Each structure stands twice: as C-alpha cells, then as structure tokens.
C-alpha cells in the first residue's frame, strides 16, 4: 500500500536526519546541526508525523547545547505528546492506515523510559538542575 510506504519512508527520513544531527554535533558544527534539526521539524510536519517525531530533533539539539529552559520545555512537550492518542488515519496522507489499538498504551510506556534515562544520563545533569525539573517529574511519573 502506498500510504504505508510513504509513512515508512517519512520515518526513515526522520531517523536519517537525527543521525546526521548526531554527526553534526559530534563534529561541533552548530550551524549544520540547527539546519538539520529545523529540516527534521519541517519534514515531520509535511509528512504528518506525530508530535513526538517532530519534537525529537529540536530536543536533541537543545540537550546537546545544554539549553536548560528550551530542553525542559521540549521534553515536557515530548512527554505530553505521548499522553495524547495519535490517530494516524486522521492525516490526509494516511487515511487508510489504521491506528493500532495498543499504540496509545505503547506510547505511554515510553514515558518512564524517557524520564529514567534523563534522570540517569550524566549529560542531562544540566536539565535536572532546571527549576521546573521536579514539577515535570511529578506531572509524568505514575
């Protein structure tokens, strides 16, 4: 089915852009990193991907730049996106693709993984020092 192929290719594109963003950050090329993050956002919106997919690159960039307020705001939006059901078939690009029944539960199961990873990652210490960190934890911990 063409819709499935488009959806799969859109996710492959997002993954490729995230990998390229990693390389740009490793090469200490902030201009290219920002361009790649912006491109990932635009591509995600054009291809009607989930908010989580659209916000991943800007969060990755903000975290790498250790921009605490921006990273915290984006992490909050990422986590919130995992609490909202995403109906893939509502997109005009994918009207015939069914939303899997277990998708919402699967999305929610990512929340503790993300919070735990962020809480343990030494590179995220700056984020845990942000004034809004305890409130974010309280909002999403179950």
Give a label for each model feature.
Residues 2-142:
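Alpha-helical protein-protein interaction modules
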């Amino acid at each position: 089915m063409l819709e499935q192929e488009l959806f799969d290719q859109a996710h492959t594109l997002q993954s490729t852009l995230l990998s390229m963003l990693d390389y740009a950050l490793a090469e200490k090329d902030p201009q290219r990193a920002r361009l790649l993050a912006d491109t990932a956002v635009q591509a995600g919106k054009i291809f009607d991907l989930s908010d989580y997919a659209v916000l991943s690159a800007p969060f990755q960039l903000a975290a790498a730049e250790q921009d605490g307020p921006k990273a915290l705001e984006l992490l909050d939006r990422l986590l919130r996106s995992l609490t909202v059901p995403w109906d893939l078939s509502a997109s005009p690009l994918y009207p015939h693709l069914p939303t899997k029944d277990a998708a919402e539960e699967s999305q929610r199961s990512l929340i503790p993984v993300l919070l735990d990873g962020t809480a343990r990652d030494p590179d995220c210490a700056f984020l845990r020092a942000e004034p809004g960190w305890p409130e974010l934890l309280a909002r999403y911990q179950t």
